[in-house]
Amino acid sequence: MLNRKINRVIKTALVCFPVAIISALLLAGNVYAAGEVFPKIPVDGQKEVPVNAQIILQSAVGLIQGPDSCFLNGEYIAPASIAGGMAIFKPGQLQFATTYTMLVRDGAFLSKVDNRPLTGGSYSFTTCSPKAKVFDAVVAKDGSGDYTSIRQAVKAAPNNRTEPWLIFVRNGVYEELVRTSTSQPNICLVGEDKERTVLKFSITSYGGHERNNSLFPEAEGQGPVLVANSSDFYLHNITVINSWGYDNQAGPQALALGSYADRFTMFNAVLKSYQDTWQTGRDEHRHYAFRSYIEGAVDFIYASGNCVFDSCTIALCRNGSVVVAPSHGAGVKYGYVFRDCNVVSSKPGTARTNNYWGRPWHNRPRTSFINTSLSKDINLSPAGWIDHMGGLPVVFAEYNTIDHMGNPVSLASRNTYYWTGSDRNNPTETCIAQAVLSKEEADALTVRTVLSGTDGWKPDNITTELPAPLLYYSENRLYWTAEPQAICYEVLYNGDFLTFTTETSLTFEGDVSGYRVRAVNMYGTLGQVSDPPFVNGIQTETAGALNVVFDGSRLLASGFCGKARVELYAIDGSKAGQYEIEENVRLDLGSVRFVIAKVTANTGTCVLKAVR
């Protein structure tokens, strides 16, 4: 009884006092059975947990890593550190408004005293909802926003920001150079439409031209059109073009993007140039590109860092194109990882022949292509890789490359021998590099494995598209269902941006059928677009023989045998009620409030958007 009372006091104290103080009290008080029970931080059942929270497990005895494991919502999680009786986990940015279960298997930890496996357990907590807000700045060439240029908006972003600073860029062609400073983390640059929101400039880095202030006064000594010198930069829904390479379809070096800091993310973006389109930074930098388009001809993704190119399109501009020129230091573990990418011609229908995955720029490069599809315009050299530049690769390999018909591409002739120096017959150094990955090796190179680091970075959370709201109207008011992870909503009219709002309704004008809504996550990622709005009133749906009618207060179903199940769902997605009905017997729903009625019978299932 005494221990249960103490536990209640501790759980209350955890909400009010710093973790370190409570941890000391727990250990000093020896409240739990030695080596068997783990205090949980967050406490079991705790609500409103910050999404950047650490998870701390404790024991009254010292802990050491055991043979078994811990899992967070079914995903393996390792402790970032173990000291004394405390194990600290850093899961990275968690999802908002989400319930998590931490499972500690028996034997995940051992007693430091006698190496005895300690008993584990499980507990749950729920993260907080996001703070409602709209974008911090809007860029519009017509003067309708806060700034008329992207450069102005980025220069005005605050220093040392710990939360995302959201910049929304309206459609337009912005001919300028954009740089972030190293003191401006967490800038999120989001375009209205990637096809119509374009940042472009003509600049070359050849011979130090970018440092010529008379030629390029806004370059600040850096050659790319867009430079992310700050950590946690996010590029979404924007096209970036270096016209020097793209317009001329020739070199020399002309960068569209330089990402020179850690935790760079790009989603649904476009990069275009010819030579050296994207420079990825140093060994310690991590980069994530998702569903983006990258175009070039010569070494157009190059430099270092652990980088994942996830479901991207790689476009080749000429015959004999070379995709990557990595320069990874010996300590880089994964290098460039391309997963589920498509390789195409920059001009569909124009063949690109005798192309190469890459060549070793410097040091000990690593590059893996996994589940890559080649369009009918693309032909790779049988060697796959160029054997000489300035480095000696550790891994230049691939797994499951297929042609446009879905047939496996032969890897039998892929190059494995590499050399440095000026004479192939008398090389300075040589190496044999891995050219083919096993399925197990390929499966292991996931986004989380390659990029999580010691801070648990989850860039795929950044790029999460929130689901489309359910949109409906009554009289001259537009309504939509709330999304728990949304900070705001973008309202579109006839396909164009209209406004941002933190509300879930607004008064509309004109033809209601032209309105659409999408939810926005905390990083500014634009979610899936809603269907057209529907009117509250008589709704009729059929599925096979099943026919369902709702007149605003009563529901009637026909065309089935036995009984049908009626499930009602509220605006927040929760179930508002469940009933069983017989054929042609009206169900009076009285004052029940719901937005979706799902009717399931032996002849089919109907879903009505019936607002109450």
Residue ranges and their predicted role:
Residues 101-105, 516-520, 596-600:
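Extracellular recognition modules
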Residues 68-70, 489-491, 566:
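Short beta-strand elements bearing conserved aromatic residues within extracellular beta-rich modules
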Residues 539-612:
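C-terminal outer-membrane/trafficking sorting elements
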Residues 122-123, 524-535, 604-612:
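Edge beta-strands of extracellular beta-sandwich domains
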Residues 128-477, 481-484, 488-490, 498-533:
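Sequence-level preference for short, compositionally simple segments enriched
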